[in-house]
Amino acid sequence: LKGYINLAGSLVVQNAGRPTYVPSKYDWGWDFSEGLARVLIHKEVDLYGFVDIYGNEVIPPKYQYAENFSEGLACVYNGIKYGYVDKNGYEIIPLKYDEAGNFSDGLAKVRIGGKYGKYSPILDKIEIEDARYGYINNLGIERIPILYSHANDFSEGLAAVCMHNKWGFINRTGNVV
């Protein structure tokens, strides 16, 4: 594991003011997100898992890729499909997507085959329409029409979108700014 050191340079993970040593079986580690840090073991195939702030392995390294936790879930990849796990390692949203991203404001952008859409955890379904992007809220209600050939997640109230090969920004009501 690389990256969790104290002021003396010793490998540690801080918790409640006392250091805890992390087993050196990990080849890499990332920043903590929502109380867990991604770790990596290099084998024939890289394997990702998660440790808590005490250095305990919470989710064993078994995924070929993983993202940091966002809104209580982490996107993981098993070498074939993407899905989402909770902080206990349970696959809450099945690994059935060809592409998936982090949750942002209750939504996650996902892709099945050549089609794109937004996954709603509340409705446990994906809204897809002719490989176009739009935005729905966490209740599955379409908030911004599905019009865009490409769309990014919202950040600081704006999202970059593409229509007719032209990029611009929209606000949360769908107005171009």
Provide a role label for each language-model segment.
Residues L1-V177:
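Residue-level detector of conserved, function-critical positions
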